[in-house]
Amino acid sequence: MTTTDRIAAAFARVSEAGRAAALIPYIAAGDPSPQATVPLMHALVRAGADLVELGVPFSDPMADGPVVQRAAERAIAQGVGLRRVLELVADFRRDDSVTPVVLMGYANPIERMGQRAFAQAAQAAGVDGVLVVDYPPEEVDEFAVMLAEAGVAPIFLLAPTSTEARIEAIGRVARGYVYYVSLKGVTGAGSLDTDDVARKLALIRRHVHIPVGVGFGIRDAASAQRIAAHADAVVIGSKLIETMEQAGAQAGADQKNEAAIAAAQQWLHTIRLALDDVKRENAPA
């Protein structure tokens, strides 16, 4: 199965199972350690993840809140950069050729590697999609083509402030899915207005004809269920990372990785069980 096929197949499986929305956890590659990342990814899949978003650690993550920033700092302190992240994806692919992996990060590491070299390396590692937070769609046509030619989906963010013209522009170039940021500000901040999200998704779907995932502000089963009634995917990161962080802090030095992985799997499974009970509000009768 090729990389972009995996994303489409994942959403198709969700639909065929009669589920309202896919579950997409976000973790920072290299946190709590590089050695724990691949086992953690497999644990998330066992817990019910349909896709996995893997954050590429960066020293100046402007869109990330304090929880995700701390995770990136821990990873960077252990020497994890873009090349190591690609190695981790390749390691994951040895045992899982089905679950899509999407890299989420910033332009600087990609620019240092070179856009074309990165696109080719991402495809070789088994990356399915790439979301670059600080690449506006109107400036990355060439890069999006490079990714698409390599079979890697260029994925874009939309926000509450996105104009209809911007939504239309992203609808033309995005592949895989679009990530709607449900709150203004950084990850893990603010409170969720589900009605506002539903209204914005209705506008987005006029111009975007691929799945739309929603993230930011989803911190528990109840908020995940509310979003799943409207979105094609629920993206959840800060609370998951915080859960791992707390479990690792309470464990002995030689048990931090195992404790973090176990806590992540247990917590994410509760979210998956909650999502399995949701019916899409705008689904046909």
UniProtKB/Swiss-Prot annotation:
Domain of life: Bacteria
Broad enzyme group: lyase
Catalyzed reactions per annotation: (1S,2R)-1-C-(indol-3-yl)glycerol 3-phosphate + L-serine = D-glyceraldehyde 3-phosphate + L-tryptophan + H2O
Listed InterPro entries: Aldolase_TIM, RibuloseP-bd_barrel, Trp_synthase_alpha_AS, Trp_synthase_suA
E.C. code: 4.2.1.20
Active site: 53 (proton acceptor), 64 (proton acceptor)
Gene Ontology CC terms, in alphabetical order: cytosol
Binding partners and assembly: Tetramer of two alpha and two beta chains.
Function summary: The alpha subunit is responsible for the aldol cleavage of indoleglycerol phosphate to indole and glyceraldehyde 3-phosphate.
Family: Belongs to the TrpA family.
Stated name of the protein: Tryptophan synthase alpha chain
Gene this protein is translated from: trpA
